[in-house]
């Protein structure tokens, strides 16, 4: 427990632990660790020591109401070997997170290399004529993930302090499009699920193979 709590405290603001332990009910576990609420125990350990963690799940606003004037949009930049990354987050003055977006700005040389490797691999298949082109092209940015937290209510009953119904997600997407355009990208893709495609269509995205895509307006 102490090891896990120490490791979680070392995580940065863009990190999220999706699962700390597998979702198996305690009666079904015949041997070994039976603490199925391990995340809760780790977070209680951190709180009991008067410490904090920047990990996303620990900072969620959850069911709390959030005042609009208490939110600010932050952009964190970092680099990988193949992309320039932008982590956008809506945060309160206490550091709680109401929503975030992960934006990737792929390097042109990385896209070229991956495209060549993809073509080389698919050229060896018997069904080459049915192979789709590499799904990401030069000049295309990628929204990898969007999440907005807060109490979920029916739209007609949405409270003014409800994070999920104040357009925070839309503002994140539009800000990501602005950042991508300023960085010189002409198009932006988004990884979407079946249930969210309608939402992205309303934001100007259209279906385009594996992803949905939106043309970007040049920024002066």
Listing of model-derived features with the role each one plays in the protein:
Residues 1, 16-40, 148-159:
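Flexible glycine/acidic-rich beta-alpha junction loops that bind and position SAM and/or redox cofactors
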Residues 2-9, 13:
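Single conserved hydrophobic/aromatic residue that forms the stacking wall/gate
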Residues 79-119, 127-151:
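A conserved beta-strand-loop-helix scaffold within acyl/acetyltransferase catalytic domains
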Residues 192-211:
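Conserved active-site alpha-helix within GNAT-family acetyltransferase domains
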């Amino acid at each position: 427990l102490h090891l896990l709590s120490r490791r979680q405290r070392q995580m940065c603001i863009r990190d999220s632990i999706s699962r700390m332990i597998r979702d198996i009910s305690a009666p079904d576990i015949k041997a070994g660790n039976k603490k199925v609420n391990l995340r809760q125990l780790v977070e209680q350990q951190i709180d009991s020591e008067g410490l904090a963690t920047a990990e996303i799940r620990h900072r969620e606003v959850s069911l709390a109401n959030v005042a609009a004037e208490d939110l600010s949009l932050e952009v964190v930049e970092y680099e990988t070997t193949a992309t320039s990354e932008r982590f956008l987050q809506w945060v309160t003055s206490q550091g709680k997170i109401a929503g975030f977006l992960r934006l990737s700005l792929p390097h042109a040389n990385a896209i070229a290399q991956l495209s060549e490797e993809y073509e080389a691999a698919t050229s060896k298949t018997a069904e080459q004529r049915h192979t789709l082109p590499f799904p990401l092209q030069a000049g295309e940015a990628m929204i990898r993930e969007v999440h907005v937290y807060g109490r979920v209510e029916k739209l007609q009953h949405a409270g003014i302090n409800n994070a999920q119904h104040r357009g925070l997600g839309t503002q994140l997407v539009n800000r990501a499009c602005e950042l991508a355009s300023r960085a010189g990208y002409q198009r932006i893709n988004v990884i979407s699920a079946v249930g969210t495609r309608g939402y992205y269509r309303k934001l100007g995205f259209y279906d385009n193979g594996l992803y949905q895509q939106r043309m970007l307006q040049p920024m002066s």
